[in-house]
Amino acid sequence: MWIQQLLGLSSMSIRWPGRSLGSHAWILIAMLQLAVDFPSCDSLGPGPEFRLLSRPQRPQRLWSLRSGPPTRLPTPAWSPRAARAERAHGPIQMQTPRARRAHRPRDQVATLGPKGGLTKPPAATRSSPSLASATASSSIVTAGAAEHQGLLRRGRRHTHDTEFNDFDFRGGRPTTETEFIAWGPTGDEDALESNTFPGGFGPTTVSILQTRKTTVATTTTTTAASTATAMTLQTKGVTESLDPWKRTPVGVSTTEPSTSPSSNGKDIQPPRILGETSGLAVHQIITITVSLIMVIAALITTLVLKNCCAPSGHTRRNSHQRKMNQQEESCQNLTDFTPARVPSSVDIFTAYNETLQCSHECVRASVPVYADETLHSTGEYKSTFNGNRTSSADRHLIPVAFVSEKWFEISC
C-alpha cells in the first residue's frame, strides 16, 4: 500500500516540477521505512536459523479412562515441515478433541478408531506409502481401542471393589473392624461368632449352633443361603484379624454379644469382664471391714474401763469405812484415861477434823473430869511449866486436858 502511495507521489513530482523538494522528502521517508522493514522480513524467511517456538507440551499419559492411549504425537498448529508433508502426502488426519470424546458413550469408543482410520483422502489411496501408513494407523487405533476397553473394565472392577473395602475375598471371611471392643473368652458353651456383612445386612452376632442350623436350611430362601455359606466358611477356618500374624481361634468372641434371646429359648449371658466380682465392689468391702474393726475396738475399750473402775470404787468404800472406825476409836480414847492406852496426835486431830459433832460430844464428856483435876492440881501445872518433870501419868494427861479445853472453847 505504501509502495503505491510512493509511486503516486513520484508521478506527482514529475507532473509538478515546482514541488520536487516535497517529493524528495517523501522518497527519503519511504527508503528509511524500507530499511527498517527489511530485517524483519529476513527473520521471517526460511533458513538454517529458522525456529518455530511452539507451546511446551505436557508429558504424555500412558492411558486414560476417557481418551485411551495416544495414537500419535500432536503437531504444532503451523510449521513449514507440516506444510511440506501435507503437500507431499496429502492432508493429515487431525485428532478429535478430547471434549468431544468425553461426551460420547463408551460403546461408540471402539468404533471411532477403525472408522477414522479407514476414511482416507483420494490422494492417499493413489499412493502406496500413504496406504501403508493408513493401515498402520488403523491397526494402532484398534489396538488402542481394545486396550481402552480393558482399562474400562478394570476401572469398573476397581470401583466395584471399593464398595467392599471391608470384606476379604480371599476366603469369603469377614475382617474385624477397629471400632469393636475385643472381649475376653466366655467359655466353650457360650462361645459366639460375629459377622459383619457389607451393604444393607449390618453387623450380626450368631452362635455356632445357630450357624449350623442355618446351613441346614439353605434351601428355604436366598438370603438364608448367602448368610449360611458365609457362616460355614467362617466356622471351618479361623477369624482373621487386622494383623495377619494374629488369628483368633474358633469359639472366641471378638465383638460385644447381643442381648436378644436366641432361637433356643435361652438368654445369652453377657461376657464377663476381667477383674469383676459377682458380689460387692472392692471399696464396699473395705468400708464394711473398717466399720467392723471400729465396733470391736469400742467394745473392748468399754470392757477394759469397767474392769478398771470396779476395784477403784471398792477401795473408796474401804477407805471411808476405815475413817469411820478411826473416829470411833478416837472418841473412845478421849474418854478412856487408863495409862496403858495413849492415843496418838494423828488420831485426835483426824477425829476432830472429820466430824465436829463427835468432837463436841467427846469434849463435853471429858470437861468435868478435867475440871475437877485441874482445881486440885494447880501447883503441878506450875511445876511443870517451871521445868520440874512430873510422873508418867501426869505427863500423859496434861496435854489431853489442855487440848480438849482449847477445842471446846473454839467450837462452842
Swiss-Prot record:
Residues 160-171 have a biased composition (Basic and acidic residues). Residues 121-146, 248-263 have a biased composition (Low complexity). GO terms for molecular function: beta-catenin binding; protein domain specific binding; protein-containing complex binding. Keywords: Cell adhesion, Cell junction, Cell membrane, Membrane, Signal, Transmembrane, Transmembrane helix. It is found in: Basolateral cell membrane; Apical cell membrane; Cell junction, Adherens junction. Residues 305-412 are annotated as: Targeting signals. InterPro entries: AJAP1, AJAP1_PANP_C. Residues 306-412 are cytoplasmic. Residues 44-284 are extracellular. The chain crosses the membrane at residues 285-305. It is a single-pass type I membrane protein. One of its GO terms (biological process) is regulation of polarized epithelial cell differentiation. Pfam families: AJAP1_PANP_C. GO terms for cellular component: adherens junction; apical plasma membrane; basolateral plasma membrane; cell surface; cell-cell contact zone; cytoplasmic side of plasma membrane. Coiled coil: none annotated. Residues 1-43 form the signal peptide. Residues 62-175, 243-271 are annotated as: Disordered. Forms a complex with CDH1 and CTNNB1; interacts directly with CTNNB1. Interacts with AP1M2 and isoform 2 of BSG/CD147. Plays a role in cell adhesion and cell migration. This is Adherens junction-associated protein 1. The gene is Ajap1.
